[in-house]
């Protein structure tokens, strides 16, 4: 086996542990969200606080007693790494964004897709039908706002049909109205800005296709009907 072909099992184990932790975080936050809804919390701030604190556990009796704790010093943990400890790492290419569950989407969206353009292209790559299938039960806490921000910042005229399809699929996901009501002020502004962009494209696109605004094609008429429906679903006026 060539030196560059040595597999870094420690890195693979670390990646697996991170994936399991992300899945657990997704389930924990959704459970906290349901509890907050059942408790009828009076404000978004309190709702958000409950979800963000979902990882905290009540203190056990032994933790409340106080007192100093002494940890034995382990000389073996401070030794220098030898040549046997060093494993040649294989350069890992960025894998395509192909989540098969909402938990995988949530994990990879937060871990690998950091920039706005990357997130926008990932949404276009998946498309409305795939997103609708992934989130048929519910969009994770805070995720709807992030999706709308990515679309608002990078939507282009050539992608208008695809963006409308994505918005339509998201509007048909579980608990959509609840997630919509929990958008932050900045996310609501992004949503408003996105629909303003889409409306502005209504006059730009016919001109590029050699049509008049008064006589759009049948396809454009269908898109305009969908846009009006989405304006109502997203509460944009």
Curated annotation (Swiss-Prot):
UniProt feature coiled coil, ranges: 8-33
Indicate yes or no for the key word Nucleus: no
Report a single Gene Ontology molecular function.
protein homodimerization activity
Kindly state the subunit structure of this protein.
Answer: Homodimer.
Kindly state which keywords UniProt assigns to this record, in alphabetical order.
Answer: Cell projection, Cilium, Cilium biogenesis/degradation, Coiled coil, Cytoplasm, Flagellum
Q: Name one GO biological process term.
A: heart looping
Question: Which N-terminal residues, if any, form the signal peptide?
Answer: none
**Which family does the record claim for this protein?**
Belongs to the DNAAF19/PR46b family.
Instruction: Quote the PANTHER family the UniProt record gives.
Output: COILED-COIL DOMAIN-CONTAINING PROTEIN 103 (PTHR28572:SF1)
> Domain of life, per the record?
Eukaryota
- Main localization of the protein described in the UniProt heading: cytoplasm
What is the official name of this protein in its record? Dynein axonemal assembly factor 19
């Amino acid at each position: 086996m060539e030196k560059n072909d040595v597999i870094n099992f420690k890195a693979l184990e670390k990646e697996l542990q991170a994936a399991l932790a992300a899945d657990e975080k997704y389930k924990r936050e959704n459970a906290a969200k349901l509890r907050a809804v059942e408790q009828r919390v009076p404000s978004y701030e309190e709702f958000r606080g409950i979800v963000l604190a979902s990882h905290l556990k009540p203190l056990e009796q032994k933790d409340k007693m106080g007192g100093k704790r002494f940890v034995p010093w382990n000389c073996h943990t401070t030794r220098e790494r030898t040549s046997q400890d060093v494993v040649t790492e294989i350069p890992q290419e960025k894998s395509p964004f192909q989540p098969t569950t909402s938990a995988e989407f949530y994990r990879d969206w937060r871990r690998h897709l950091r920039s706005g353009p990357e997130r926008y292209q990932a949404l276009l790559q998946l498309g409305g039908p795939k997103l609708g299938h992934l989130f048929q039960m519910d969009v994770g806490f805070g995720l709807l706002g992030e999706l709308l921000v990515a679309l608002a910042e990078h939507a282009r005229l050539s992608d208008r049909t695809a963006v409308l399809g994505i918005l339509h699929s998201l509007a048909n996901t579980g608990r959509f109205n609840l997630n919509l009501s929990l958008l932050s002020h900045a996310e609501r502004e992004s949503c408003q800005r996105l629909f303003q962009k889409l409306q502005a494209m209504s006059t730009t696109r016919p001109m590029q296709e050699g049509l008049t605004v008064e006589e759009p094609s049948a396809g454009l008429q269908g898109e305009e009907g969908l846009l009006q429906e989405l304006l109502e679903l997203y509460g944009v006026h």
